[in-house]
């Protein structure tokens, strides 16, 4: 029994060490984004940047500094030293302001809000479209027998092997000739045509019992009605997994958007972040604030829908 | 499948027509996806092959160039360097990440439900963040003067290095970063497959007097082989397409020290606008990935 628990402690500490390494970069994004960027000592002689500090400050220094000034302000108030109290109170509000200044500059001097909105709405439009089109295609490919079914399926599946970079140049020419360059259509249409979901949906639809579909047909339901009110509700777990992955892919998509988008107000978050970095190479507080804003939604989505992530990965993976 | 296709194909044309008319709804269901697929995937794929044999002019027509694009691809120093870099990057990171995922998953699997959930989340969470974010923060962590990385390796007695700025360390900086990002997909897939290995196998081994390590080597690892094959293929394909880190952290430099195939395609196509050459490079990338996938699949499947 004793030996067992030593082993377990060892395993847990090893895994904890590994998870610290794995989570450290994300922690560093948030820590730097909230780090004090310029801070004056009490004697007003020296201005320190805790962002560019060697050795690095491991957490936002505004937190201890804030409480230090708070304590001093309280003390000064007790001693009726109004001048000192005001100074420390001012420092407290300065610290808060400086701590969040990266985020403020993102929204006031850059179009962060616009980029966020663009990413969000493109992600939603593509996800809804993919869920609808892929489940329709997956349904008939799994449950209907018609001439050409296998050819269509294998045609679609065989392109899954082709790296997406192969189509970059022709797609660029096509988008340009269609007059869609520097528009959101240039992102939405290609994203809607991704084929992975068809494969996933077809796999999933197989497990829906034929009897249910037959029964709906006998009851006189139209093909659309059968799909909409019998098949779709049964495919919910698969749809959830596909939806999350589609949204995540679109939200994080980078190579194609940097090729087709030129106007700053049309950028998605990843494109905006790249131009932000190009323009502020060494302003790491600003850059990490941008990175934090892009990371937060995906972290929230993951924490809420964790179960579906696992499901989607195992569905898309080996099912042998 | 289930004999129905055989009967369809053996029917006369008239039968096919009849069957198509009867199933018109199925075609309507397929229509939106199929249209998008044809326009934005099938046509561009075919077009890419055609373009790779052409000299593309922005104004005026395209001229046939025969194999000259392919010859320039293989003669160019940049492409050779990109191919070499991408290969080194893949050869180091893929085995390392798959093996660490296997070990991590095995350790996690031995724990209770709560701990399993916690570690699964801790290892998967960093992979939901966009590579753009990861690359930006690692560029900051690799900062020569103020970077966290130089500080941490200082604890172990290493001198600070200008990781991304020197041609002898830049590629390794990219590789180390990839090694330290947990292979979340791998861990989750391995965990799922492990829970489907039958307990009776382990019980039988225990009766035969096998210890934990022997059971792991003789039962767990072989039983997980399908997952391993899938993960190696998946991450090799992904690895050959490495791009985001490169453009955000080094721009392929210094010199060609971190040039990779996809970054080179990007530069050739969309900075220099040499469409024919970029198309040829991407076709070459496709065949490299295809050949490696087939070889890996065969090698890993060999003894079954």
Predicted region positions:
Chain B
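Short, Lys/Arg-rich, polar N-terminal cytosolic tail immediately upstream
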Residues: 1-21
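A structural signal for multi-pass alpha-helical bundles of membrane permease subunits
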Residues: 22-304
């Amino acid at each position: 029994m004793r030996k067992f628990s030593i082993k377990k402690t060892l395993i847990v500490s090893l895994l904890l060490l590994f998870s610290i390494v794995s989570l450290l970069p994300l922690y560093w994004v948030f820590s730097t984004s909230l780090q004090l960027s310029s801070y004056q000592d009490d004697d007003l002689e020296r201005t320190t940047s805790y962002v560019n500090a060697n050795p690095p400050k491991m957490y936002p220094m505004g937190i201890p500094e804030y409480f230090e000034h708070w304590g001093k302000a309280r003390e000064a108030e007790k001693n009726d030293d109004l001048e000192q109290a005001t100074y420390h109170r001012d420092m407290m509000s300065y610290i808060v302001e400086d701590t969040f200044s990266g985020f403020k500059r993102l929204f006031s001097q850059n179009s962060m809000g616009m980029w966020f909105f663009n990413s969000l709405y493109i992600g939603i439009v593509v996800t809804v479209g993919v869920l609808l089109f892929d489940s329709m295609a997956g349904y008939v490919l799994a449950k209907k027998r018609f001439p050409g079914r296998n050819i269509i399926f294998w045609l679609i599946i065989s392109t899954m092997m082709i790296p997406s970079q192969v189509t970059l140049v022709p797609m660029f020419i096509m988008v340009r000739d269609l007059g869609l360059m520097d528009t959101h259509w240039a992102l939405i249409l290609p994203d809607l045509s991704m084929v992975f979901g068809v494969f996933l949906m077809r796999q999933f639809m197989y497990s829906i019992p034929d009897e249910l579909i037959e029964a709906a047909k006998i009851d006189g339901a139209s093909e659309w009605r059968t799909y909409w009110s019998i098949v779709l509700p049964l495919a919910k777990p698969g749809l959830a997994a596909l939806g999350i992955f589609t949204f995540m892919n679109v939200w994080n998509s980078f190579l194609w958007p940097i090729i087709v988008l030129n106007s700053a107000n049309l950028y998605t978050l990843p494109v905006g972040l790249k131009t932000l970095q190009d323009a502020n190479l060494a302003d790491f507080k600003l850059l990490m604030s941008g990175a934090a804003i892009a990371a937060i939604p995906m972290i929230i989505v993951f924490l809420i829908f964790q179960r579906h992530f696992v499901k989607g990965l195992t569905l898309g993976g080996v099912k042998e | 499948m289930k004999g129905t296709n055989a009967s369809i194909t053996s029917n006369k044309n008239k039968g096919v027509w009849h069957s198509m008319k009867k199933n018109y709804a199925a075609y309507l269901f397929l229509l939106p996806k199929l249209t998008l697929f044809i326009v934005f995937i099938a046509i561009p794929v075919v077009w890419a092959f055609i373009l790779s044999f052409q000299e593309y002019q922005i104004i005026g027509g395209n001229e046939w160039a025969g194999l000259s694009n392919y010859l320039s691809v293989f003669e160019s120093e940049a492409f050779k360097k990109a191919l070499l870099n991408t290969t080194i990057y893949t050869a180091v990171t893929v085995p390392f990440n798959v093996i660490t995922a296997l070990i991590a998953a095995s350790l996690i699997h031995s724990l209770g439900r709560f701990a399993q959930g916690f570690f699964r989340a801790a290892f998967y969470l960093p992979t939901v963040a966009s590579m753009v974010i990861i690359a930006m923060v690692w560029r900051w962590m690799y900062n020569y003067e103020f970077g966290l990385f130089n500080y941490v390796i200082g604890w172990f007695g290493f001198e600070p290095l200008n990781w991304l700025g020197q041609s002898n360390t830049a590629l390794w900086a990219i590789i180390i970063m990839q090694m330290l990002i947990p292979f979340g997909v791998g861990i989750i897939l391995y965990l799922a497959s492990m829970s489907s290995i039958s307990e009776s196998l382990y019980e039988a081994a225990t009766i035969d007097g096998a210890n934990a390590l022997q059971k792991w080597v003789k039962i767990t690892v072989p039983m997980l082989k399908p997952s391993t094959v899938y993960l190696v293929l998946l991450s090799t394909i992904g690895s050959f397409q490495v791009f985001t880190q490169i453009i955000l952290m080094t721009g392929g430099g210094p010199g060609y020290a971190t040039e990779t195939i996809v970054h080179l395609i990007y530069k050739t196509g969309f900075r220099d606008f040499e469409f024919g050459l970029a198309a040829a490079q991407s076709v070459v990338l496709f065949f490299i990935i295809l050949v490696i996938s087939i070889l890996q699949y065969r090698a890993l499947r060999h003894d079954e």
